[in-house]
């Protein structure tokens, strides 16, 4: 699904460092935090835009709606996503809501590798013009539902550390699992396309 995206950012500082160390490839990290900061600045100026927020649970949905309202937005729609089967993703209820609302932006705030699959599913099924943004939990840095990341922490690739301190039970396991990226980078043939 990532290969079929219109645009993908290097938002993992760990991945960027691995490319530098093992492949001598220099890329700049462009985090979800930084992207959403710029996007939210855009929305503050363009308050007439409509947002459809796909959220992981009711609590985050309330926080996300409250934050988007604080930007001055009036047309905000929220949807609490069910637990998706990434091999057979199908959500007719979501499709029907989106076809009815026709938002300018669909903000997919679910993680766990499902956001990109849902984004592709929507891209292939929707016929109206919209922008689908798969940002995972990045909005939680603004709503304060997750670790309180700021520009300094983001710039120096310390977001992972702050998340680990803020919620060790979730992120320790996630980061241990993420170590599999090391051999993937080492043994993959990576081409740079200009």
Stretch-by-stretch model annotation:
Residues 98, 102-108, 112:
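Proline-aspartate-enriched helix->loop->beta-strand connector
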Residues 81-87, 128-164:
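Short, flexible loop segments at boundaries between secondary-structure elements
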Residues 14-22, 148-194:
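A transmembrane-helix-recognition feature enriched in membrane-embedded lipid enzymes
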Residues 43-71, 176-189:
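An alpha-beta-alpha
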Residues 71-85:
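Short beta-strand elements in bilobed, periplasmic/extracellular small-molecule ligand-binding domains
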Residues 1-50, 56, 60:
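Electropositive, gly/pro-rich neighborhoods at or near active sites that engage anionic ligands
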Residues 84-96:
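Structural motif
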Residues 14, 110-115, 138:
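Short glycine-rich anion-binding loops that position phosphate/pyrophosphate groups of nucleotides
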